[in-house]
Curated annotation (Swiss-Prot):
GO biological process: phosphoenolpyruvate-dependent sugar phosphotransferase system
Keyword set includes Plastid: no
Organism: Bacillus subtilis (strain 168)
Modified residues (Phosphohistidine): H67
Name used for this protein in its record: PTS system fructose-specific EIIABC component
Ranges where the PTS EIIA type-2 domain occurs: 5-149
Domain (PTS EIIB type-2): residue spans on this chain: 172-267
Localization (cell): Cell membrane
Biased composition (Acidic residues): 152-162
Length: 635
């Protein structure tokens, strides 16, 4: 497939009007929307902003490639926008962006589409193409330039195989990967290959893109390589590099600093990889990684914890909503001895409560351990988490089990390094499961479970004994945490605490947490309705969507507004969410469902007071926004 089957005259804008990043993104999203490529403009924009929050797609050299792969895209497409004066896109080199290519990929985009999208990023690495695009005078000229240089993947591979690698100082290997696998993955690969050719160095680059792994490194190549560059912002297969010198960096380093990386690899200026199981690019030896993504124990702990929480959430949401639906027939409708007993309600409660929700601690522990030690950590983590559930050690016991199992397996990997390479196949199928489950199980049974269960029991009793003042303070803190970063670490920490308390049998904290999480989008929706002169027409349209997202407990619905005006929106959201959280505790509302938004309000002990708390919080936020935001003048 040619790139110009995705980039058409209808998705080209020769003169971008906006000068700042947020407005440029909005302008380019509008181009795709008007061309009929999107079914949910706001959801697509949120996906773009979410990708930008990870690292800027302004890669330098005057190029920005915002991209997202989401179900809000009808057909894969590329939009092109040009600014001869340049726009402030927060590019990695600090320079203005002149060429903006916005890539829209469908959730189920086939390989043909993805390969064409990926090929675009490699074309833009060539200076002569960028110059031609800047000087083109019409949409047709843009199309002609792309067609002139575009080659199908088969042609590229033939050309690559036909041209022997230059004689140099030894063959080095590289792996590139980014979260979406559309742009940065291939731009980093292309930058490394171009620079290696210039330096006279033989290189092979494996790309982990959306269409799968290409040019996969063989065991023999890995064995012979002096060093391996891993430029990746997502997990890649790392155990194959054990014992080799590996330079781990963010994918943007592959684009921005290819010569430095290649020279380090050739000089073997890289640590020996010990097989810890991590595949993230941000390593401690890379200064850029330290500056942008953090380092140290706290960052590592958070990464592993979020791996567990993100994989646990489907069980929480699915199981929790099934339990909530069963309450339509009555709170005790699953009890055969209660007059409200209903067979179908009992089945829903059994599926959601007795099975799905009973797995959450084990799943949490399993995926934490897997994040630490790769697949060998999964089984010991699951077993440890299940033991915590059985011993009433709850969520905290599961957290401990996950980290314990992960590092037990890391220790086992170091202990069994004496085993001959010919017997390596026994490690993942026999040695790690056997000793990992045994050691984790023994430690959980005789060291962890009893004191943690006692602590969880104490914590539950303490929370139940709190007076109104302390409860309100707790509600204010938890509600505010849900709005500070809207889906970020503090939001996830509060949500995780709420789930832990539900698991321990205390339903008050999660009432404040869910109320606080609903306020940001609802407050914005109200503000766009009441204070219409403070928002653009586009914002008012997006505000309608926020009513539904807020009602469904999707805090992230407020992110586009917060990203566009953080100094006004975030403080207002925190105050409103804190008010809602504090009121739920003042009214002593309890909520046994982990998810569901206003649709599970009826299962609280005080449904109307709970809804009132949410409404008051949203109104407070809307009023603050109405006061602090200035009227807008639309063109």
């Amino acid at each position: 497939m040619k790139i110009t089957e995705l980039l058409t005259k209808h998705t080209i804008k020769l003169n971008i009007e906006s000068k700042e990043k947020e407005n440029v993104i909005d302008e380019m999203v509008t181009v795709l929307d008007k061309a009929g490529k999107l079914n949910d403009r706001q959801a697509y924009k949120e996906a773009i902003l979410n990708r930008e929050s990870q690292s800027s797609t302004g890669i330098g050299e005057g190029i920005a490639i915002p991209h997202a792969k989401t179900a809000s895209v009808i057909n894969p497409a590329i939009a092109f926008g040009r600014s001869k004066d340049g726009v402030d896109y927060e590019s990695l080199d600090g320079q203005p962006a002149h060429l903006v290519f916005m890539i829209a990929a469908t959730e189920g985009a086939n390989n043909t589409h993805l390969e064409a999208l990926s090929r675009l990023s490699t074309l833009l690495m060539r200076e002569e193409i960028r110059k031609q695009l800047l000087e083109a005078e019409s949409e047709d000229a843009i199309i002609d330039i792309i067609n002139q240089h575009d080659k199908d993947d088969d042609e590229e591979e033939e050309e690559e195989e036909a041209a022997p690698a230059p004689a140099g100082k030894g063959k080095i290997l590289a792996v590139t990967a980014c979260p979406t696998g559309i742009a940065h993955t291939f731009m980093a690969a292309d930058a490394l290959k171009e620079k290696a050719k210039e330096l006279g160095v033989e290189i092979k680059v494996e790309t982990n893109g959306s269409s799968g792994i290409k040019h996969k490194l063989t065991a023999q190549e890995i064995e012979d390589a002096p060093a391996i560059i891993v430029a990746a912002d997502k997990q890649v297969e790392m155990e194959r590099f054990k014992g080799k010198r590996v330079l781990q960096v963010p994918v943007t380093a592959g684009i921005r600093r290819p010569q430095e990386l290649i020279e380090k690899a050739m000089n073997q200026d890289a640590p020996i990889y010990q097989g810890s199981g991590g595949g993230s690019a941000a390593s401690n030896d890379d200064e850029e990684a330290k500056g942008k993504s953090g380092s140290g124990i706290g960052n590592t702990f958070y990464k592993h914890l979020m791996s567990g929480v993100s994989n646990m959430l489907p069980f929480v949401v699915g199981g929790g909503i099934l339990v909530a639906i069963s309450f339509f027939w009555g709170i005790h409708s699953a009890d055969p001895n209660d007059p409200s007993y209903n067979t179908f309600a009992a089945a829903l409660n059994f599926i959601g409560g007795d099975n799905a929700l009973k797995l959450i601690v084990a799943v949490l522990a399993g995926f934490i351990a897997m994040s630490i030690a790769d697949r060998p950590g999964f089984a010991p983590g699951m077993v440890g988490g299940f033991m915590a559930t059985q011993a009433n050690a709850g969520f905290l016991g599961g957290l401990i089990a996950g980290f314990l199992a992960g590092y037990v397996v890391i220790l086992l990997k170091k202990v069994f390094t004496f085993i001959p390479q010919s017997l390596d196949g026994l490690k993942p199928v026999l040695i790690y499961p056997l000793f990992g489950i045994f050691i984790t199980g023994v430690l959980m049974q005789f060291v962890v479970n009893t004191p943690v269960a006692a602590f969880m029991n104490f914590l539950t009793n303490w929370l139940e004994s709190l007076g109104t003042g302390n409860l309100v303070l707790m509600g204010i803190i938890l509600g505010g945490m849900m709005a500070i970063d809207m889906g970020g670490p503090l939001n996830k920490a509060a949500f995780t605490f709420g789930i832990a308390m539900i698991d321990a049998g205390n339903y008050a904290p999660h009432a404040a947490i869910m109320a606080g999480g609903m306020v940001p989008p609802l407050g914005i929706a109200l503000a766009t309705t009441i204070f219409r002169n403070k928002f653009t027409q586009r914002d008012r349209e997006a505000g309608i969507t926020c009513y539904f997202m807020g009602a469904a407990f999707v805090t992230e619905g407020a992110i586009p507004f917060a990203a566009a005006d953080p100094l006004r929106v975030i403080p207002a959201a925190v105050v409103g969410a804190a008010v809602a959280g504090g009121l739920t505790e003042f009214f002593r509302v309890t909520l046994p469902a982990p998810h569901g938004g206003v649709f599970v309000a009826f299962i609280t002990n005080h449904p109307m007071l709970y809804l009132l708390s949410i409404v008051i919080g949203a109104v407070v936020m809307a009023i603050i926004l109405g006061i602090v935001k200035k009227p807008v003048t639309e063109k």
